[in-house]
């Protein structure tokens, strides 16, 4: 198995009292993902090392976001290109954020992405992945 650890957040007030499980089984990983509720349990991270991991966040109303990095610099977001250009609000990592509706996938899709990454460390090729764009904006005064 490619994944070496599982981090599952569990927010109690403003404190994360989640778990870190070394050498998790697929059953432990699947259970942690299924427990995401968008309230107290908002993020699961599957790590191979400090720079390579897959994160699944959200869970409320059956909406999840999934992203992967292999170098902690470039990130791939799982997307559903059939969805409209709209914004959904999700709690991820204990905070509410605005996410493109295209980034919000269902549980089965999130589990498929996690299962492939867990087993092989690769992106599931039957799904759509999009490289995250840099969020840095330069002022014309600084150029």
Predicted features and spans:
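Broad, structure-driven detector of short, well-ordered beta-strand segments within folded domains
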Residues: 51-61, 77
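Glycine-centered tight beta-turn/hairpin loop motif at sheet-sheet or coil-to-beta transitions
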Residues: 49-51, 72
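Acidic, proline/glycine-rich low-complexity IDRs
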Residues: 1-35, 63-143
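A short, Trp-centered hydrophobic/proline-enriched beta-strand micro-motif
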Residues: 40-46
């Amino acid at each position: 198995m490619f994944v070496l650890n599982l981090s599952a957040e569990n927010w109690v007030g403003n404190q994360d009292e989640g778990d870190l499980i070394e050498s998790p089984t697929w059953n432990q990983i699947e259970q942690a993902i299924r427990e995401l509720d968008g309230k107290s349990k908002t993020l699961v991270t599957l790590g191979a090392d400090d720079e390579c991991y897959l994160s699944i966040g959200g869970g409320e109303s059956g909406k999840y976001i999934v992203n992967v990095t292999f170098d902690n610099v470039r990130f791939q977001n799982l997307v559903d290109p059939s969805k409209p250009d709209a914004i959904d609000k999700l709690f991820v990592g204990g905070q509410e954020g605005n996410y493109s509706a295209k980034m919000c996938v269902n549980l089965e899709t999130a589990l498929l992405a996690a299962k492939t990454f867990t087993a092989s460390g690769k992106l599931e090729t039957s799904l759509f992945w999009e490289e995250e764009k840099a969020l840095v904006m330069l002022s014309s005064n600084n150029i």
